[in-house]
């Protein structure tokens, strides 16, 4: 009986500890969401017949207007593009705004690409993502934007 009492006691303590560490009791406005503009990750995927970009900042992507997708990054920051679901390979081509890069995007293995931003106060690059899916060898291209901007 003592063993059962100990188990119940430990269980109740662990439930109490979990409720203390939960953020459910804090109003959502009080939980500060940190957005990292120094190290940005953009994941490229192909889902339900559509190309998608999801970045670590949560910027909205509209597959009907991919050229409106904009990622913000701090001066001197780094960006990494990675392949997600159903992307076989991709490469990044800078169409305009090369001056915002310290190191231009470099594809290491056709599924990861890295770039380092210059220490400029602001700027914009338009770039193309040329990708193939696991369903086809045909190449597709979309043209999002990358904005270099100081953030507080």
Description of each model-found segment:
Residues 67-106:
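Contiguous segments within soluble domain cores/interaction surfaces
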Residues 108-152:
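Extracellular/periplasmic metallocenter environments
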Residues 2, 20-22, 34, 42, ...:
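Intrinsically disordered/low-complexity terminal segments and short unstructured peptides
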């Amino acid at each position: 009986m003592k063993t059962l009492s100990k188990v119940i006691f430990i269980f109740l303590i662990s439930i109490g500890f979990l409720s203390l560490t939960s953020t459910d009791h804090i109003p959502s406005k009080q939980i500060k969401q940190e957005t990292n503009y120094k190290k940005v990750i953009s994941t490229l995927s192909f889902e339900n017949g559509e190309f998608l970009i999801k970045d670590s900042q949560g910027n909205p992507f509209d597959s009907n207007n991919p050229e409106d997708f904009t990622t913000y990054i701090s001066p001197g920051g780094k960006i990494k593009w990675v392949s997600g679901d159903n992307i076989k390979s991709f490469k990044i081509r800078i169409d305009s705004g090369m001056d915002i890069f310290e190191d231009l995007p470099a594809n290491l293995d056709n599924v990861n690409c890295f770039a380092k931003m210059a220490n400029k106060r602001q700027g914009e690059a338009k770039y193309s993502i040329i990708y193939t899916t696991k369903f086809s060898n045909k190449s597709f291209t979309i043209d999002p934007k990358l904005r270099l901007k100081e953030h507080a």
